[in-house]
């Protein structure tokens, strides 16, 4: 019989559910949030692969969990977006470095951090409008994440590279981001939800207009971390593993300095 069988009376292995998180962070945006650190083209086999090199800042921790695609809490490990940003090869992103840095700075040992990956590579901000698949999935996953009593502490948002090629998209970015934040806060009933967005480091065309909108957004409880100058891979678009670690630490510092 395929798949084997369980003898009558034989105990099924017990699955230990982790203690649910009490501090929850949403990770959203496009590919640099999903993580492409360490992803390279294997020309021999003509496919993209992750090198599986894991910096110590990104090491797993039993007190850092992630919400899987099927809405279960499990111990977090890279790639955080493996079952979320599907159809692509994910590698190291900023999430684990961020979570470890925050965990190390918190004064209580009882803190359990929950990461909710929602990013999707190659997406423009108009694809995150209320009613879209990506927006509604993010809201659903966020709502699910707090059913066990955890508190949504912040949204980390890294997106914009797909909005630099068209002048209209670039000039509309600020208004679109403003609307996204207001919609998300309203739909989650969290009017003061902290948002930490990343000013993009790469992309051609009208990148300066998108960055200007990101750095100049004037909303309460919104801060911006600038990724400009962080090391890029040979594609001049995605952050290296080292850069993702640096970004994660910068995001943690922004959170701890502004919202703790």
UniProtKB/Swiss-Prot annotation:
Record: active site: 31, 235, 238
InterPro entries in the record: Carb_Esterase_6, SASA, SGNH_hydro_sf
Keyword list, A-Z: Hydrolase
The protein's Enzyme Commission number: 3.1.-.-
UniProt-annotated stretches for the region Disordered: 1-22
Protein family: Belongs to the carbohydrate esterase 6 family.
Protein name: Probable carbohydrate esterase At4g34215
């Amino acid at each position: 019989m395929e798949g084997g069988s369980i003898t009558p009376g034989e105990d099924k292995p017990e699955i230990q559910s982790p203690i649910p998180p009490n501090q929850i962070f949403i990770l959203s945006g496009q590919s640099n949030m999903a993580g492409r650190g360490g992803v390279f083209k294997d020309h021999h086999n003509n496919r993209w692969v992750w090198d599986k090199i894991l910096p110590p800042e990104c090491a797993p921790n039993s007190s850092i969990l992630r919400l899987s695609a099927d809405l279960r809490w499990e111990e977090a490990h890279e790639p955080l977006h493996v079952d979320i940003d599907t159809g692509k090869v994910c590698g190291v992103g900023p999430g684990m470095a961020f979570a470890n840095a925050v965990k190390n700075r918190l004064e209580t040992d009882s803190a359990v951090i929950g990461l909710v990956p929602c990013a999707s590579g190659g997406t423009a901000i108009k694809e995150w409008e209320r009613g879209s698949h990506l927006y509604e999935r993010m809201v659903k996953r966020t709502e699910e994440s707090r059913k066990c009593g955890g508190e949504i502490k912040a949204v980390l948002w890294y997106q914009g590279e797909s909005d630099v090629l068209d002048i209209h998209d670039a000039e509309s970015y600020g208004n679109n981001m403003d609307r996204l934040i207001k919609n998300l806060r309203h739909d989650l009933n969290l009017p003061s939800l902290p948002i930490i967005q990343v000013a993009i480091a790469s992309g051609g065309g009208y990148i300066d207009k998108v960055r200007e909108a990101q750095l100049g957004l004037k909303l309460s409880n919104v801060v911006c971390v600038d990724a400009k100058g962080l090391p890029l891979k040979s594609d001049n678009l995605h952050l290296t593993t080292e850069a993702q670690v640096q970004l994660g630490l910068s995001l943690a510092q922004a959170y701890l300095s502004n919202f703790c």
